[in-house]
Regions:
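Amphipathic alpha-helical interface surfaces
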Residues: 66, 70-74, 96, 118-121, ...
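A short mixed-secondary-structure module that forms the rim of ligand-binding clefts
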Residues: 54, 58-81
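Active-site and ligand/interface coordination hotspots across diverse enzymes
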Residues: 1-63
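Conserved acidic residues
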Residues: 41-42, 93, 133-137
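Structured alpha/beta reader/binder surfaces that contact nucleic acids or chromatin modification marks
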Residues: 64-65, 84-89, 130
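Glycine/proline-rich loop-helix segments at beta-alpha junctions forming the active-site rim
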Residues: 105-158
Length: 158
C-alpha cells in the first residue's frame, strides 16, 4: 500500500526561533483524494513528538506528506493486525496520530528539553484531535514520558 500522512503544520515562536507544531496528523494506508478527505478512523496512537516528517503544502494548511519510519511502522503493525483478524483494511481508513507534545523535531532529546522548559508546548499547543473519541488508543512511547502526560487523554468508562 502507498502510505502517507496528512497534517497541519503551524509556526510557533520558541526562544526567538520559529519552530513547527504538527497537528491533526492522520496516517493513511492509501493516499486520500485530497488532504482534507475525512476517511474512517480505525484507532489512534500516542507518540512522544512529531519527528522528521514534512508536508508538501504551505504552513497553516492541511497538507499531504510521506511517512517517516515511525509512521510506516505504525501502519504496518495495523496492517498485520487486520490480516491476523482475517479482515481487509477498510477503504479510506486512517490512524490518528496524537503526541504528548507537538513540536516537530527529529531529535527527541532536544524536543523533550524544549517541552520541559516551555510549559506552553503542553498547554497552548494541544491538538484539537485529542478531544475526539477513538475506537482505541495505543500509547506508544518510551521512558521519557512523565506520569502526568497521559492524564489529558479521555478514556471511556465501562
Amino acid at each position: 500500500m502507498s502510505h502517507c500522512f496528512t497534517a497541519v503544520f503551524e509556526p510557533c515562536l520558541i526562544n526567538g526561533k520559529t519552530e513547527l507544531l504538527r497537528h491533526n496528523t492522520r496516517l493513511w494506508f492509501k493516499r486520500p483524494e485530497s488532504p482534507s478527505f475525512e476517511g474512517t478512523c480505525v484507532g489512534a496512537v500516542v507518540g512522544l513528538n512529531p519527528g522528521s516528517a514534512k508536508g508538501d503544502a504551505e504552513i497553516g494548511r492541511e497538507t499531504l506528506g510521506n511517512c517517516d519510519p515511525t509512521m510506516d511502522r505504525i501502519l504496518t503493525t495495523f496492517e498485520i493486525a487486520f490480516k491476523l483478524k482475517g479482515l481487509p483494511v477498510p477503504e479510506g481508513a486512517y490512524v490518528q496520530m496524537l503526541n504528548l507534545f507537538y513540536l516537530r523535531d527529529a531529535c527527541a532529546s532536544a524536543a523533550i528539553a524544549a517541552r520541559d522548559e516551555i510549559a506552553q508546548l503542553l498547554t497552548n499547543a494541544r491538538d484539537k484531535a485529542e478531544e475526539r473519541e477513538f475506537p482505541f488508543l495505543w500509547l506508544a512511547w518510551g521512558k521519557s514520558a512523565r506520569a502526568d502526560d497521559v492524564d489529558r487523554f479521555p478514556t471511556k468508562s465501562k
